[in-house]
Amino acid sequence: MDKKLISWMGVAITNHDFTPRGYQLEKRYFSTFIKADDIAFYVFCPYTTLLKFVESKKAKFPKKLHWEGLHKIHFILHKFGVAPAEEVIAEIKDYERKPKLKEFRELAIKLVAAHKDSVKPNENVLEYVEVRSEALGVHEKIPLVIDNHPVIEYFVEMVLPPSYEDQLRLTLYALLLEEKFNIDIDYGFAEYPLMKVSHKIQIDSDLRKDAITKRAEMEKIIIEKKVDREVPVDIKKCNTCYYQDECPYWRRGKIQFFV
């Protein structure tokens, strides 16, 4: 790998060999902090970076409250070691009809009410762990951490392999936790609570290298205010994008990046 120093408007990023852990902390300087989740969005589609960081557009999360409620239930189940009974799973699956986050929280409380006197909370199950890394130029509130391992959650009634962007998201979570707790983390988890399935995801050096490389690519786009390539439209992906309403290009046969 070329070891020359690349400079973008005074922001220097060292393009040199990565350590076996997947990244090199020396001589790495960033002008801004970027959320790990936004890096995953960039991998999903580079135009999301322009929309958010250059044009100040807002993503729309129509099921955000539903996700937060389901996450809270999932967290409570792990925290207190309560097995999700079939009737609970059935109620969770019916979450679409529930209009308020309060109802989810009430359900989560009910799940542990019968166990609160006999079951102690697991201190190794953490929620919304906030980490800010000067070395990586990344910050995030990690939704779920179990025994120091990051977890990504899928509240769907199927089990599909985690996408590449979600693997990078998990990797960035691991890098942040490694720095916060001064430990090595070699794997995380993808969990499917509605299916009672948990998969271990290895966080290897390639994923680590890719995560840091993608973060550097985002920095370049933000500074230059453009993406120097065209991205074919994938209708299935575009229809699930949180920036769809703000994207002026997705209905075309090809997304062109000009700002």
Which functions belong to the PLM regions below?
Residues M1-P150, V259:
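Metal-dependent nuclease catalytic cores that hydrolyze phosphodiester bonds in DNA/RNA
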Residues S56-K57, L175-K180:
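Active-site catalytic microenvironments for nucleophilic, acid-base chemistry
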Residues K57, M158-P161:
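Short, surface-exposed beta-strand-loop junctions and turns on beta-sheet-rich folds
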Residues E123-G137, P161-Y164, E179-V259:
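Metal-dependent nuclease catalytic regions and adjoining charged, substrate-binding loops involved
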Residues P143, E153, R169:
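Acidic active-site catalytic centers that drive phospho-/nucleotidyl reactions
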Residues V151-M158:
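Structural signature of nuclease core domains in nucleic-acid processing machines
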Residues D166-L177:
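Short, charged, amphipathic alpha-helix that recurs within catalytic cores of restriction-modification
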